[in-house]
Amino acid sequence: MTKVFVSSVINAPIDEVWAKIRSFNSLADWHPAIADSHIEGNEPSDKVGCIRNFNLQGGGNIREQLLALSDLDRVCTYSILVSPMPIENYVATLRLIKVTDGNQTYAEWTAEFNCSVSDDADMIETVGSGVFQSGLSALKAILGN
């Protein structure tokens, strides 16, 4: 199983960051790689089990399912159902933690998935830098870093 871990400190209060990412359908509002997104079947975007269907800026479509959402812990876990990436059994978690020294937020985005040995390094780079770090960097820019 391949594991990816990316973290960052966002110079914004945790409630503000959580408000930006909480909706499972908000990805297109803050992630630069996402062209458009919708929740299938017009389900609520915070309903565990709902499916996010989005198109990438560079082409390609991804479908993801919300597995867990906690306002108390400020954490969201989801899986990929369909992706152009050569991965299987993908589960990711985006977690926020209040930084007590200042009005900041620690964000960590992790994933575990299976892929072939030959794709492992590329998928770690794609998910870690292309998805997670670019998303966290965009949040930092949007929220004032």
Label the model's feature ranges:
Residues D36-E40, P84, I97-K98, E125-S129:
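Juxtamembrane/interface motifs at transmembrane-helix termini
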Residues Y106, E112-N145:
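A conserved amphipathic terminal alpha-helix motif
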Residues V6-I10, L94, W109-A111:
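A structural signal for short, well-ordered beta-strand segments
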Residues A28-D29, N55-Q104, E112-C115, I142:
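Hydrophobic-ligand binding "helix-grip"
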Residues K47-V48:
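Short, solvent-exposed linear patches
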Residues M1-P44:
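Hydrophobic ligand-binding cavity/cleft-lining segments
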